[in-house]
Structures are given as C-alpha cells and as structure tokens.
Amino acid sequence: RSLVGSEMCIRDSYDPRVSFLATVDEKKIAALMCLEITDGMDLHSYNGPVVERTAYKAGLIKAGTSYRLITHLEQKALRIAAMTQRETGCAISIHTENGTMGPQILDILAAAGADLEKTVLCHVQRDPNLVYYKKLLDRGAVLCIEEANKPHLRSDQALAEILKQLVDAGYKQQLLLGMDGGRQEALAAYMAPEGIANGLSYLFADFAPMLLQQGISASALEMMLVHNPARVFSMEVS
C-alpha cells in the first residue's frame, strides 16, 4: 500500500499579474518543483513568504489543461513539468478537461523532452472514442480510465466495454484504473454521517469483478491495477 503525493500547476486558474507561474522563469519554477521531489514538499505550497520543507516528498508531477484549449500559462506549466521530469525521472499526470487536447498536450511535452511512457493522461474516458485513444496510446502515453460508479456520466458497463476493447487491441500495458475520487462524496468515511456510501474500494470490490465478467483476463486486470502503476510511478530516490 502506498500514497503518492503530487505537486501541481493545474489549469489556467492563476492570476496572470501576480502568480509565480505567470511571473517566474520556467527554469526557476522547475528547480522548485525538483526540490519538492528530492528534498521535501513545502509546508506552505510555495505560497511564501518562507519555504519550510516537510519530510514528505512528492512522487508525481501534475499539470492540467482547459476544455478544447491549452492556454499560454498551461503551456508553460506543461514545459515545466517536462523539465522537472527530465531532472528527476518522476511521472507526469495530466488533467485533461473532458478528455480534450490529448495530442496537443503530448506535442508540447515531447518537444520539451518529456518521457511519454511516464506520462499519464487522465479523464480521457469523458470522450469515448476508441480511435482517439489509440492515437494517444500509439505515441507511448499512458491512459488512466476512471469514474466507475458515476452513472450520471456513463454506466459501468459502458466503461468496462471501453477497457475490453483497449485490452483486446493490445494496449493493456498502457492502461491505469482510477476513481477520480478526491471529492467528499466519493469517500465512504466522509459520507458515513449521512449513511452508507460507496468509497474508493468500489474499484476493487465491484468494478474489477465486472471487468472479469466482461472477459478481461485476470492477468490483464493485474497488469492494470498492479504492474503498470509500479512501472509508471517508479523512480530513483536518494
């Protein structure tokens, strides 16, 4: 069992007049990001005025893009993510808004020297397009297929069918499974005062058995749940 802390510049939600993402040189920000991985995460999330390193080191670089758009600041964040990865070997996780802009994200990261085999594109299941997925996977990227137990978005059955098609097409080594469950309603312990709720364990207790029933082999499921995360998130630590 493990928890991986991430450091992030996610989407264009930073004030272009005063935020450090907007006003500080890319190389200087990348140096700060590297220190979060090698030395420890800042207690104040670099909000200043001082930096106090904690004992906890980041193990994931995160950036994000907008819906059908990558703003100038988001492009800068992607380049910084690539620079940080080059120095540390840490994986990059990209928030895509409704799965859009995947090819353009990979273009920017590749041009900045990122390792696309350690680059995870998240939320792509929002755009259920097998041709689109294959275009991203054929460039070496990793896709995180998420949002089981969210019937207001799509049924679990539809999500399972997407995964079965990708596994059958030979991409099982480039797939991760997740819940996108950072909000309160996705956490059983937080919802306990209200009653019984499905938590993050739904992925293993309910969705994984459905994948087996769908015809995905136990070895392919283990690949997506165990071996792929171990490979993608591995890095040399001092």
Segment roles from a protein language model:
Residues 31-53, 160-172:
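Short amphipathic alpha-helices and their capping/turn segments at secondary-structure boundaries
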Residues 121-127, 146-165:
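Active-site glycine- and acidic-residue-rich loops that bind
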Residues 11-14, 66, 97-99, 124-127, ...:
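Active-site beta-loop-alpha junctions enriched in small/polar residues
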Residues 146-147, 171-194, 221:
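Short acidic/histidine-rich active-site segments
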